[in-house]
Amino acid sequence: LLIQDIDDLVAGDVFIVQGQSNAAAVMYNGSSGAYQNDYLRVYSGGYTGSSSVLSDDNWYYAQGDGNENTGGNAGQWGLALAKMIKDQLNIPIAIFNGAHGGQPIEFFQRPSDYISSTDSNYGRLFYRLQKTGLKEKVRGLLWSQGEANAGATNNLSIEQYKTYFENLMMFWQQDYPNIEHYYLFQTRECNCGTNSSGRLLVKEAQRLLAVENNNVNIMPTTGMQVHSDYCHYPFVNGYEKFALRIFPQVMKDIYGLTLQESIYAPMITDISLSGNILEIQTDSESLVSNNSNTTALINSLNNDFVFSDSSISIVNFQLDSSKLILTLNQNPSNNTTLSFIGLSSNLEDNITNGSGIELVSFSNLCISGNCDGSSGQNSTDQDKKPAIVFVEDGSGNV
């Protein structure tokens, strides 16, 4: 007696993509269709409303060119990453993309009724994973968000943004207990309703989340080509590059496979000043200049490195293994801070590691004096928190 006939059944690994529009990663210019494959799946969709997610009880072959309200959408870089994992390991991949464009980090927090209600973004994502029985199967979570917290009306302090994200990690670990790693795409210089001071705060918060937590990696997006709206990305050299860059990290962190060297973005670990010589130490094995035109690269460095003392400029530079040494036009005044903002996507305009990955942006690090109000946090690995992060709520509970 045949009770039910089931075909096209797969079993594999699960990843979550979350954030705002650059996590939704809709098609702006160029299709991701070449990455579609029968072994990449999406349940329902990352719908922005309750009724839509409740009414769509379908599994789809993953596609990347739709939007939040398109059934089966994984986002362009979510789809590309899934295909890369599948091709490398012969493992089917399910992507749960919960992104919602234009939303601040507060929007993604877990409400008290998330188990019983799909009115919230958190509740809708939880519903999809609970309905499919895959809550315990999530291996990793990838996050691209920050622009909505970097504008004139919704700025968060560095500590506020960090706390919101660490709260999310705590909730995600409770609800999806087998998440092994988190991947942050650092917000880049952009329009998107942002301003310069807001971007500095968000980027520094994201950097410190990676510095201070063992299970968080960060990937800069300076090296991605920006769409004409100076906010989103085309597919080629944009969203596809999101996947290409993060794929080797996923392979190493989650699957234990090393596919290439220099897969992590260079992070500042120390900064020191002697007269007009500024030394920036990174955790990279070696730094690389990608431009034989020294004058052009110095011009780029002057655009990327922003001193609070605007009379300071860079007149020369030297690379010494993992160290970038800048010669300044004068000794900085007392309480001078330095930020690296990252403007150009061109390889030749950036100091990178051996794989062409540029520096992680940092904000308002003190190079002379005490610099009250600067982040001043150059934590090293030994200061990192354990992989499962516990954060107190307003009542002192964890």
Predicted regions and their residues:
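Cell-envelope and extracellular/periplasmic
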Residues: 1-373
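Short, solvent-exposed loop/linker segments at the N-terminal edge
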Residues: 270-274, 392-398
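Ser/Thr/Gly/Pro-rich low-complexity, disordered linker/stalk segments of secreted
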Residues: 371-389, 395
